[in-house]
Regions:
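PAS-family sensory modules
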Residues: 1-34, 119, 123-144
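PAS-family sensory domains
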Residues: 2, 51-126
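PAS-family sensory domain signal
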Residues: 12-66
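A general structural signal for short secondary-structure boundary/capping elements
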Residues: 41, 110-114, 141-144
């Protein structure tokens, strides 16, 4: 795609970047995409701004993001990431967890993602949206 320079590790993200940029301009939710082979990720500008994240394609986003997740919610996050990136599951349920925002307060997010597979059934792209859960009544504090 013209105007986008990428390393070979960025693969599918670089190819999808113009579409990703268009979507982030029209979506009020936070969006993300992860190349399942290279583990490179890209997040929307709004997500990067609200949570002090690196902009552009990041090579260690998954670990960086985990560091922002509330300690009580990290295991649930790890299990979700393992289901997608290690086990290659495409039927993952939505996950709700707390993340430390730019100003230091924790906010509840609901993450919904799906896996795109190649012709041989191998996962190549994990993409989705995250939404803030503003009202306390939206989250069951016992089950998350």
């Amino acid at each position: 795609m013209e105007g986008y320079k990428s390393s070979p590790a960025e693969g599918i993200l670089a190819k999808s970047r113009p579409l990703f940029d268009l979507l982030q301009q029209t979506c009020s939710q936070y969006i993300f995409a992860c190349d399942m082979q290279s583990r490179c990720c890209i997040v929307s500008e709004k997500l990067a701004e609200d949570f002090a994240l690196p902009r552009g394609i990041s090579h260690d986003f998954i670990n960086f993001w985990e560091g922002l997740i509330h300690p009580e919610d990290r295991q649930r996050y790890r299990e979700s990431i393992k289901a997608v990136l290690v086990e290659g599951r495409s039927d993952i349920p939505d996950i709700v967890y707390r993340v430390k925002a730019r100003r230091g307060e924790y906010v509840w997010l609901q993450c919904s993602g799906r896996v795109r597979c190649n012709k041989s059934g191998q996962g190549v792209l994990f993409a989705g949206v995250m939404s803030k859960l503003v009202q306390k009544g939206k989250v069951d504090m016992l089950t998350g």
